[in-house]
Amino acid sequence: MSEQIRTASVIMAAGRGSRMTPYEGNKTLLPLIPEKSFFEGKEPILVRILQMLPPGPKAVIVNYKSQDVKTLTQHMRVVYCHQPELNGTGGAILAARDFLADADCESVTITMGDVPFVRPESYRRLLETLKNHHMAVLGFIPSDKKRYGVLEISGEKVERITEWKYWRSYPDAKQSSLNICNSGIYAVRRQELLKFLPILESRPQIVHKERNGQMVAIQEYFLTDIVEYMNADGLSAGYVLTADESETMGIDDLESLQKAQELYRKMAVKVTAA
């Protein structure tokens, strides 16, 4: 077995997950083993993620139903970082700035709070990629890439991560060449990440979202922007590709929750049989 690399981990668990209707809780606490209903059971998603991450200090980004998150994970010796506003993945990392500054690790692993099937081996490969790059992105090839952000790659380097709303207007030939999608899971050299946080904070993007039945303009920060900042500064981002897109499956609605619970059941059967 390969030696595990110690890293500081940040898990984004602040959002509500508005598509998970009629569930009213924090979606990272949904069960992988349903009992009374799909929404009640054992093996919370977030706990599974924390168990799979490499060794080292861990911070959970909280906001919505934060006390519920703390209650279910307090036995796991994690740090909680409050994200005052739900203002994007970059906003979540900015909320963890003090944790990152104090972490006694050379690297940082960043993951979403709804992707429970990422294997320890994939985290290790991401961290090993930091030997040659300053940042590493976990990519996957989906059966349908619509709605996903894509990695724009040159050789072994990721030049930028482009969201669906932008790349869908690319010429057909260019669209066809973009096959690797962004999982939202990263490894970054800690000092380089800290260096670019002030730049990220100074460059919010304006997005339009519905709030109380009305479309409003709000400021959000996107962690993916750091890839372009690094490239502009002469640094590089690499990538690692998963073998199976189910490994990076996010759970954001009832259909994906049911798929995840069935996948987890099959995984448990395989382990028992072995």
Where are these regions (language model features)?
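Conserved N-terminal catalytic core of the sugar/cofactor nucleotidyltransferase
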Residues: 1-8, 19, 36-128
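Short N-terminal binding/cap micro-motifs at the start of the first secondary-structure element
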Residues: 17-21, 146
